[in-house]
């Protein structure tokens, strides 16, 4: 099983004139690796995976895998609210050379705990590929609780969980039920990386790493080494920047920020709309105060 730990980036999908900008994506991936990022996570929430076609997702994953060349893990977004589509997505990630697949809980149709269990076990049985479950109830309208996660872990259906509830009690419950190192525990909230790691987490799948990869890597390293004084200093320093990444629906603000760095365009795919001028101003000001060099 790949070592799912450290600072991973939920990488944006650059777009130009309505199409995926593979050149910019390759350059972003190379920059992330040069800055010390441990894993690249394409086609997730931040990568607008839900509005990419299957062919586009394949293009994105292939490009990231080709650039990474084993220098960073690739955990490819492959979820769907239809189990048969999620299976095909995971099969594609496997065939394209990803190290694991990130599979969000089924959104909109609100499955029961039993439905969630059957969803992930069906994926595992059909693919035999490492799956990181992704629990983000604010996006999906379903919360996969600790009992279901533990049941899946014990069945071998998942190798990790990206937990985006910002609940430390939830993380402690997961460790209590599953064990500290039985699966990978990855934070899905940049705001809570320090306490999450203190509660047994192994790392983060980060939005802010798209614009400040070295800072997030330093924070994760400090926390994992137990230097919580330094880690907290870094977390506090990043707080304003973290907040403005969600001043409007993500990934709008972070794509705007990537554009302000001159690394890719800010284009989003509908129904997401460009951030307002007021929000863009807040993003620019926070980046400047943080010390990022704008293009």
Curated annotation (Swiss-Prot):
The site annotation (Part of a proton relay during catalysis) covers 45, 108
Which molecular function GO terms apply here? 4-hydroxy-tetrahydrodipicolinate synthase activity
State where pyruvate binds.
46, 205
Which keywords has UniProt assigned to this entry?
Amino-acid biosynthesis, Cytoplasm, Diaminopimelate biosynthesis, Lyase, Lysine biosynthesis, Schiff base
Residues annotated as catalytic = 134, 162
> Per its UniProt record, what Pfam families does this chain match?
DHDPS (PF00701)
Q: Which reaction does it catalyse?
A: L-aspartate 4-semialdehyde + pyruvate = (2S,4S)-4-hydroxy-2,3,4,5-tetrahydrodipicolinate + H2O + H(+)
Main location class: cytoplasm
Which Enzyme Commission number(s) are listed?
A: 4.3.3.7
Q: Which CDD domains match?
A: DHDPS (cd00950)
Q: Which SUPFAM superfamilies match?
A: Aldolase
Q: What InterPro entries is this protein classified in?
A: Aldolase_TIM, DapA, DapA-like, Schiff_base-form_aldolases_AS, Schiff_base-form_aldolases_CS
Membrane among keywords: no
Q: Which GO terms describe its cellular component?
A: cytosol
Leader sequence range is: none
Reported function:
Catalyzes the condensation of (S)-aspartate-beta-semialdehyde [(S)-ASA] and pyruvate to 4-hydroxy-tetrahydrodipicolinate (HTPA).
Per the similarity annotation, which family is this? Belongs to the DapA family.
Q: What is this protein called?
A: 4-hydroxy-tetrahydrodipicolinate synthase
Recite the lineage of the species.
Bacteria, Pseudomonadati, Myxococcota, Myxococcia, Myxococcales
Gene name tied to this protein: dapA
